[in-house]
């Protein structure tokens, strides 16, 4: 890990850990837990879905059975989109802003390096969270899809999903997004 990556990755890890732990206090059974960022690699937030939240969403919105899989993994429809962002991600925002002031956005090579570093920091954080066992709270880990996802999604989401999860455990997600 590079010296530039470590502080950013650790800050994202700490913020996401606090947000996920607070969220998991509700005792619901989670199957979707992600860090989200934009195609510009802005500061990430978390999003999550639980079995119980999906059931409430489907019932409240009269979602037809055949459409449920599309909502099941939709960060935009998640009631837990950006959960804990204001409370826990302020240091992350500050670090990103500090890095922004050092970047020449007209220099494509410099921007690509920064973009890749930011995504690597997010992947580092989600892997570190996984290693702590956090995604096994309230449900077995193999039932939880984890990832660093982009808004809007792109093919790199699939690559990261396969590196962070057992492909057998995310068959449904893969059938929708690949």
Model segments located where?
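Glycine-rich, aromatic-bearing surface loops/beta-hairpins
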Residues: 131-178
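A short, structural micro-pattern
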Residues: 27, 67, 138-140
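Polybasic, proline/glycine-rich intrinsically disordered low-complexity segments
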Residues: 54-115
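Charge-rich, solvent-exposed alpha-helical interaction surfaces
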Residues: 11, 15, 19, 91, ...
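Alpha-helix boundary/N-cap detector
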Residues: 3, 7, 11, 83, ...
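Short N-terminal edge-element motif at the start of the domain
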Residues: 1-30
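N-terminal interaction modules that seed assembly of large macromolecular complexes
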Residues: 23-64
């Amino acid at each position: 890990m590079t010296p530039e990556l470590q502080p950013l990755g650790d800050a994202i890890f700490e913020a996401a850990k606090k947000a996920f732990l607070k969220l998991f206090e509700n005792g619901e059974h989670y199957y979707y837990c992600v860090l989200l960022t934009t195609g510009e690699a802005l500061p990430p937030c978390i999003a999550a879905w639980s079995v119980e939240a999906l059931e409430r969403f489907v019932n409240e919105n009269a979602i037809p059975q055949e459409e449920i899989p599309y909502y099941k993994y939709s960060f935009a429809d998640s009631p837990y989109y950006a959960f804990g962002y204001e409370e826990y991600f302020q240091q992350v925002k500050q670090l990103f802003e500090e890095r922004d002031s050092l970047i020449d956005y007209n220099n494509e090579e410099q921007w690509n390096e920064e973009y890749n570093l930011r995504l690597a920091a997010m992947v580092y954080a989600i892997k570190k969270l996984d290693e702590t066992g956090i995604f096994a709270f309230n449900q077995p880990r193999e039932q939880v899809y984890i990832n660093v996802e982009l808004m809007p999604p792109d093919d790199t989401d699939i690559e990261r999903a396969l590196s962070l999860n057992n492909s057998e455990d995310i068959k449904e997600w893969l059938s929708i997004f690949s």
